[in-house]
């Protein structure tokens, strides 16, 4: 009798994460898997035995095609960090998970997500090997940040990059409409990888001169040099548009956003929420009187 498969989605959603889910489902059925289960809200939901049978949801080819074009995470997501299974307390979580997988007669485990989700898959695979489990654990790449190792371009990045290019072009149009001095700083996602921020360059075309500056987390950031560069640019043109990554770091390794007074929350994986980079830089530029903002007369 064929083993069953189970698939989950984790981390932030993308425009195409459900296309990956559809691909996993179709591949499992084509290769002879039994039932295909879905985890509701990732491993966090699985620990609470919250699952569904995807065979009951995806009954026709049209259902699958619609799933491919449905944004966000169809199964729901989570940000749950599995503990270290080498500790007695941590191992109880794995024992519980593998008991649930045994009850469902799972032979194939798929997890769609980014780096943190791959961390989850790695831990489950290691523990499975430790206890001699024959379950195959497979990670399915998904991240708009495009920062997964040995992956040239991750599903989700292309859609996000295109979106950023379009939005930046619209912002550039708006910023130049009044003919007054403006500095527009756009903060873009990207903790340690600048692929998304670099996509702001896509705004440049025959009908648009593009952004004036792109600041990436891979390049050490100097606030004084940034202000000086803005000042030089404003002597040449009144309106400047800058794309800056949320994760730009100072030369000493601190995030620029840490210079602000904002409170930064931390998620289950210990990642600090990086917000306020653009606000801090905008306030710094404004404080030095390099920017003049006027309201249009209606």
Description of each model-found segment:
Residues 4-12, 74-78, 107-113, 139, ...:
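Short glycine-rich or small-residue beta-strand-to-loop segments that form or flank ligand, phosphate
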Residues 25-61, 122, 126-173:
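Glycine/threonine-rich beta-strand-loop-alpha-helix active-site module
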Residues 10-12, 39-45, 79-80, 114-115, ...:
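Short, ordered loop/turn segments at secondary-structure junctions
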């Amino acid at each position: 009798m064929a083993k069953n498969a189970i698939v989950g989605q984790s981390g932030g959603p993308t425009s195409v994460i459900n296309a990956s889910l559809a691909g996993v489902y179709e591949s499992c059925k084509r290769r002879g898997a039994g039932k295909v289960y879905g985890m509701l809200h990732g491993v966090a939901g699985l620990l609470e035995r919250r699952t569904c049978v995807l065979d009951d949801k995806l009954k026709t080819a049209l259902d699958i095609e619609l799933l491919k074009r449905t944004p966000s995470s169809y199964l729901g997501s989570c940000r749950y960090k599995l503990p270290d299974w080498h500790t007695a307390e941590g191992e109880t979580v794995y024992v519980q998970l593998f008991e649930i997988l045994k009850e469902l007669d799972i032979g194939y485990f798929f997890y769609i997500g980014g780096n943190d989700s791959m961390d989850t898959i790695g831990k489950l695979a290691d523990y499975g090997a430790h206890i001699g489990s024959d379950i195959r654990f497979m990670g399915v790449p998904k991240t708009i940040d495009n920062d997964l190792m040995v992956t040239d371009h991750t599903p989700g990045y292309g859609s996000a990059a295109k979106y950023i290019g379009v939005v930046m072009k619209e912002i550039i149009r708006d910023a130049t409409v009044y003919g007054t001095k403006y500095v527009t700083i756009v903060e873009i996602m990207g903790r340690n990888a600048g692929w998304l921020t670099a996509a702001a360059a896509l705004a440049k075309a025959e009908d648009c001169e593009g952004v004036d500056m792109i600041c990436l987390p891979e390049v050490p950031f100097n606030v004084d040099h940034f202000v000086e560069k803005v000042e030089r640019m404003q002597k040449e043109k009144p309106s400047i548009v800058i794309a800056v990554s949320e994760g730009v770091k100072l030369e000493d390794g601190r995030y620029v956003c840490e210079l602000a007074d904002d409170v930064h929350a931390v998620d289950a994986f210990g990642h600090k929420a990086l917000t306020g980079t653009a606000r801090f830089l905008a306030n710094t530029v404004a404080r030095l009187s390099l920017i003049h903002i006027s309201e249009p007369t209606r």
